[in-house]
Amino acid sequence: MIKHFRHAIEETLPWLSSIGADPTGGMTRLLYSPEWLETQQQFKKRMAESGLETRFDDVGNLYGRLCGTQFPEQVILSGSHIDTVVNGGNLDGQFGALAAWLALDWLKATYGAPLRAVEVVSMAEEEGSRFPYVFWGSKNIFGLANPEEVRHIQDAKGTGFVDAMQACGFTLPAAPLAARTDIRAFVELHIEQGCVLESNGQSIGVVNAIVGQRRYTVTLNGESNHAGTTPMGYRRDTVHAFSRICSQSIEKAKQHGDPLVLTFGKVEPQPNTVNVVPGKTTFTIDCRHTDAAVLREFTEQLENDMRAICDEMDISIDIDLWMDEAPVPMNAELVAALTRLCETEQLNYRIMHSGAGHDAQIFAPRVPTCMIFVPSINGISHNPAERTNINDLAEGVKTLALMLHQLAWQK
């Protein structure tokens, strides 16, 4: 079984990865780009050739369906997103969609038609890399995406969302799509994008929850002034204020310990020149934890600490909390079933949380959902160096196939 999946991956992953490949060795496949469209069309063709019924929905989510014999109205769904970050790797997202197809193809050849329908989904978008909107694919599956929220947004080059969509043959719906009600379960295979599995010599992660996230944009306003003639005690230096906030907050996060993580990812001082005291600094904060109460308590204290530092330094502060996503638990029964499967197959696995967001977090509050992780070499992702050992990839597809067999071929 592992040998079969290893061969299948070696044959199909380079093919799928060639569409949108960067000269640097990475991949760029943004929503409604020519590369995105070619990928979805080619994947649709390959799934159809393998005997699946294929279709696009109104926004470009791609499905490949194997009909069920006894419960055709019940769907077991598996897959992931097909888009990438700019100059990303070739496993994040697309391997989950590819793996679902490879698993289903093997199951069909081995066991014939399932009792319940099984669908592979290659979701249109998850990353938010081209337009300022995330989970466009999975949100539309459940009627959660409001077309008015994207109607007037543009990418960095000034191309409108609607125009890009139309260029690929799709039309923005006038209203949210009808939510699917036929999905009995969703299983997503994904690379870990971290170093836990590899560091512990384990090949499979059974995900029990996806962390909650709070993201901020913070703006500090002080006073720009001459770098040579303004004494240190008279400055309203926003970079100095930022450095204090950053250092103090990170130390508190370290003291708090896992699974809390805190990142200051983007810093923009103004006027950003060598001989002027920076009078304005804008920065972002990303904080994550598996417990909603802990996440809220830590970030509220962080907000108070920032205000206290700015008050002391005579600097005004504007705090914009623009993302507040609660932690999302996976379905307990599916997690237990997946755990039993790993035990039966004597897999080297661990139960763990996901520190990154995934399409599964959109599914989980609405349908029974579980996730399978495979290791990321050196924990690297969103990078051309994103890699996973071929045997671990094959182990992941095998685990997915066995899970789908339980859900769709057994009563």
Where does each model-flagged region fall?
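A non-catalytic alpha/beta surface segment that caps or lines the substrate-entry region
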Residues: 21-67
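A short beta-alpha structural unit
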Residues: 29-32, 263-272, 284-290, 316-335
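His/Asp/Glu-rich mid-to-C-terminal helical/loop segments that flank catalytic regions of hydrolases
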Residues: 38, 210, 226, 230-256, ...
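Alpha-helical metal-binding/catalytic segments enriched in His/Glu/Asp
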Residues: 78, 88-127, 214-220, 226-252, ...
